[in-house]
């Protein structure tokens, strides 16, 4: 009976360990006031060692899914330009497969400049989609909802 209980316990622990979700990127969101009505919305990706997060802009031969941002319309906010990337971009190339990618390791900051139309407090809301890979595998794309107070 003890052997059966031990075997079941080992099996359950084994299944639990294999079912763990890998999440090699953590996100933080904030806003920085630039002037009276101008803010920078900052989306910071902290990437675990050995993993890569893909840039929004990829070469033509890339198969990686680029990071993308989709902001909800807000009558109190104007979006000023595109999301900028601040970090050390790496250009990856695999000549055997004939593919390349623009990617980040460790940390990258995505910045969207916005202008308030009035004095009311509001949030920038939306979602981001990204994919991460290491040298052995790529994880399926993930979507993260965001809400950032201005």
Question: Which sequence ranges carry the predicted segments?
Answer:
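Bacterial Sec-dependent N-terminal signal peptides
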Residues: 1-22
